């Protein structure tokens, strides 16, 4: 059970991440998409399903977005209305700053009623007028801390520049956050540096390490590669060249993802860090969706072989 694993700081947590259908999708098509999603997930050995809140981040950069932004259905409503037969925990993302305190309180009550767990994220642009701060949002959630858990995001790329991700994580831990889901990892050294510095900071301050969940995503095309970079995901130049030169970029990226997972399993185990993985499936191409299922099963097997996942 996801809640118990996070509360007990058990390693081997395995998540699968999706985005809801586009908001202009006809209702009958939404039902069809949800049914296909359920068919894929019912036999998948995962602890929880992550449902992302899709935001337009164009304002944070002057670079042109490789794919046009399209709004998506509300992740909580999509989960409640269409994914209720999937009897696993749901983790719902939400940008806290876009909502008032009353709106967030009502939303959190709805999540708690359904045994869903929130992950609060920042607003899509630096100049966005914030209605509720993250600190305030965590305070609103805190009434449920005895029977729930709350997550946040961690961005290894940010740590590579600002060198303060360990401090950011510890600040959120002080607000009750017990698990952190990373941005997609393609630079394993960036991810390991966050763990190294966080581990040192926790030891220094006498705190237990939180659960770190690494997001892993296969890349099926050059366009997707460009989009990942636009999102701020760092792909080392040698790896980027290797992927671009590959005859089958999807197959090559799967190899890379498995190598990254193996290295992180070994590293986190050596550091006694509670950890897990979140395999993203945000593409619409059948091949990429099937690749995400393969990757989830593969990483699950790797965790079991290492004696980490039961």
Give short role names for the model-derived ranges:
Residues 2-163, 244-248, 252, 282-310:
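Active-site beta->alpha loop and helix N-cap motifs at the rims of alpha/beta catalytic domains
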Residues 17, 49, 111, 172, ...:
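Conserved, mostly hydrophobic/aromatic
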Residues 45, 86-88, 112-117, 145-147, ...:
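Glycine-enriched alpha-helix->loop->beta-strand junction motifs that scaffold or abut catalytic
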Residues 118-126, 174-190, 240, 277-284:
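Glycine-rich phosphate-binding active-site loops on the catalytic face of alpha/beta enzymes
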Residues 134, 139-141, 193-213:
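Short acidic, glycine/proline-enriched helix-loop-strand junctions
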Residues 146-187:
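Ligand/cofactor pocket segment of small-molecule handling proteins
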Residues 153, 181-183, 211-217, 280:
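Short, conserved beta-strand edge motifs with alternating hydrophobic and charged residues
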Residues 207-274:
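Catalytic-face loop-and-helix region of soluble metabolic enzyme cores
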